[in-house]
Each structure stands twice: as C-alpha cells, then as structure tokens.
C-alpha cells in the first residue's frame, strides 16, 4: 500500500506530555522558545498545559512552575501559523477550565478518558462543541480494550459531538498489528467526516512504526514530540517521524531540518535526564503501565527500597490506570512490607 500524497496533521506533545519528565516545571521562556521553533518548522498544532491537562496542578499530579493560564497566555500570542490545543481529563479539568482555555485562544480541546469510560466525557465534549472548538475524544490506555470495545467508546464520544477520535497507546505497549486492528475498526465505525488520530509512546521503540501503521489504516492526526520528550521513554520522536514520512511521501508540512534543530538545540539541552528506553521505561511498555507512572515509581523505589521495575510490574498486574498515581506509593509500601525491606 502506497501512502505517497497522504496528508497528515502532526500534533506536537513536547509542551504537554513533555511536562511529565520535566516534573511540570518548564519556564515560560522554555515554553515560548520551543513553541516558536515548532511554529517556524511548520508544526500545525501544539499542545500546551500541565502534563495531566487543564487543572492538573495538585498534590496528586504535581505543581507546575506556572499556571495553565500563564503558559497559554505566553505561547498563543507568539504563534504565527500554528494553533494551540489543550488536554482535559474529566475529574481533573472542569468546564470552567475549558471556557478559560477557549477565551485565551485555544483552538483544539482534547477530552481524555480511560478507554472504557467515554461516558464521563459527555459534558465536556458537548460544551466544547457549543463553543465551536475543534473537539477531540481521546481514549487512553487503548491496549486495555479490544477493537470492538474501542468502537463502542469511540461512537459514544462521536455522539457527544467530537469531530475527531484518538486511539491512545498511553503505555507504549501496542505493536503495529494491534494498532492496525484497533484503528481500522474505529475508522470503519465512525462517520466519514470524523477524523481519526493516534498517540504513541516509545517504550518498546514502536512509536514511529505504530504511527505509520495508524496512517495506513486511515489515521490523519498523529501525535509526536521533539526529541521524544514525554512520559516513559517519551512520545514518538517527531523529527524521526517527519523524516520517515518524507521518505514515504506522506505530506506533513513540517520541515525535516528545522524540526531536527528544535529537538537538538532547544529540547535536548532542557532535559533533566536522557529520554531513553531504560529498564524501567521498557517495563512500562512490556507490562502495559501508564507512562507518567515512571517518575512516581522511581521516587517510591528510592523511598521504600523496592526496585522501580518490580513496582511497575505489580501495577501492571493490578491493572492500574491513569489517575491512580496515589496507588503507586501504596503498592510500594505493601511490597516493602511483604519483602521485609
């Protein structure tokens, strides 16, 4: 199957998912420098919020260096061509957060739920459509639901008014075959005018391969991050994805050299540690654990003397999902007690 001439919208995650490894402490200068670089490189859509979305500032998820309003207010006025998006998780973000984002100039809102809980998104998706925003339903941890199950959840979000549905590999656990199975089923079930997106993580080094697999079965929005900056081993590395798309004739509108420069000159120097597939990030992908659990598990490991890898495997065995960050320490305490540490 040739993908030459296929047009894809690349959606940058550096300034939202990338907040996880930065412990949500990016400065306004870092945000604006990277955002303007992405804009100049031709990236059409850039996500800006706390790593856990609008309203994420909390004891549970971490306190950011600045408020969502401050980050959005700094970035949006500097954009020449790119539009800015925001993530919202019902139960963390509220309708008031949604209205605030719209008033600041946010173009796209992505309403995210666990892949079996789309029904909690109705209020937020409905309001976003009333506000005439580009409205995305974002189904997280997609490996934990079957293709048939994802179809039901996607159709719920579509019925609430979402004009794009994302299948999200939050754990970086899926392989290309699993991506194709899920996205092809969702694509066939949605209205032709409803867009389809894919969000990948690189914990098994499958980010680019899975993104191409998604494009093959009809996805036209693809998430990626410069230098892969994101939870776990990072998101699909954008500069690599753009280069591969260029070689395949997939049209992204993003300049290969410019996005590579953003990654190398702006993002890599900002990293607090290398974003790579270490033993713990690999365990996230292998065990199917939510990507942002990584730093929480490492902190619990240092505190209780249980290897982070063992904590992550146990979290996977228990089926923990995004939003249960408080259970990581509880799990580590239980394991330490059982081991007599």
Curated annotation (Swiss-Prot):
Annotated Pyruvate carboxyltransferase domain ranges read 8-260
In terms of PROSITE patterns, this protein maps to: PYR_CT
- Entry annotation: catalytic residues: 20 (proton acceptor)
Q: Which family does it belong to?
A: Belongs to the 4-hydroxy-2-oxovalerate aldolase family.
Reading the lineage from the top rank, the first entry is: Bacteria
Q: Which Pfam families match?
A: DmpG_comm (PF07836), HMGL-like (PF00682)
The reply to whether Disulfide bond figures as a keyword in the UniProt entry is no
Name the chain's protein.
4-hydroxy-2-oxovalerate aldolase 2
Q: Which residues bind substrate?
A: 16-17, 170, 199, 290
Query: What is the source species?
Result: Dechloromonas aromatica (strain RCB)
Give UniProt keywords alphabetically: Aromatic hydrocarbons catabolism, Lyase, Manganese, Metal-binding
């Amino acid at each position: 199957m040739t993908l030459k001439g296929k047009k894809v919208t690349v959606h940058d995650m550096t300034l939202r998912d990338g907040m996880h490894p930065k412990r949500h402490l990016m400065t306004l200068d870092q945000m604006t420098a990277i955002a303007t670089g992405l804009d100049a490189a031709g990236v059409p859509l850039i996500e800006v919020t706390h790593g856990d979305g609008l309203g994420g500032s909390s004891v549970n998820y971490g306190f950011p260096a600045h408020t969502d309003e401050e980050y959005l207010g700094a970035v949006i006025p500097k954009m020449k061509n790119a539009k800015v998006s925001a993530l919202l998780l019902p139960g963390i973000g509220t309708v008031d957060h949604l209205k605030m984002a719209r008033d600041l100039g946010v173009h796209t809102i992505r309403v995210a739920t666990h892949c079996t809980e789309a029904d909690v998104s109705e209020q937020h998706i409905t309001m976003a459509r009333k506000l005439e925003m580009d409205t995305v339903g974002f189904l997280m941890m997609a490996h934990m639901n079957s293709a048939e199950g994802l179809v039901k959840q996607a159709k719920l979000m579509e019925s609430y008014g979402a004009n794009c549905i994302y299948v999200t590999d939050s754990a970086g656990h899926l392989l290309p075959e699993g991506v194709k199975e899920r996205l092809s089923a969702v694509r066939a079930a949605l209205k032709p005018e409803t867009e389809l997106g894919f969000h990948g993580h690189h914990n098994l080094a499958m980010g680019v391969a899975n993104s191409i697999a998604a494009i093959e079965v009809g996805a036209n929005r693809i998430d990626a991050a410069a230098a892969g900056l994101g939870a776990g081993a990072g998101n699909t590395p954008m500069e690599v994805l753009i280069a591969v798309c260029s070689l395949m004739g997939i049209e992204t509108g993003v300049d290969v050299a410019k996005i590579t420069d953003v990654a190398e000159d702006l993002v890599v120097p900002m990293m607090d540690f290398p974003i790579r597939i270490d033993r713990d990030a690999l365990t996230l992908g292998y065990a199917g654990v939510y990507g942002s659990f990584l730093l929480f598990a490492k902190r619990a490991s240092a505190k209780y003397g249980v290897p982070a890898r063992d904590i992550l495997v146990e979290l996977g065995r228990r089926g923990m999902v995004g939003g249960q960050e408080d259970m990581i320490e509880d799990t580590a305490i239980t394991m330490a007690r059982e081991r007599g540490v």
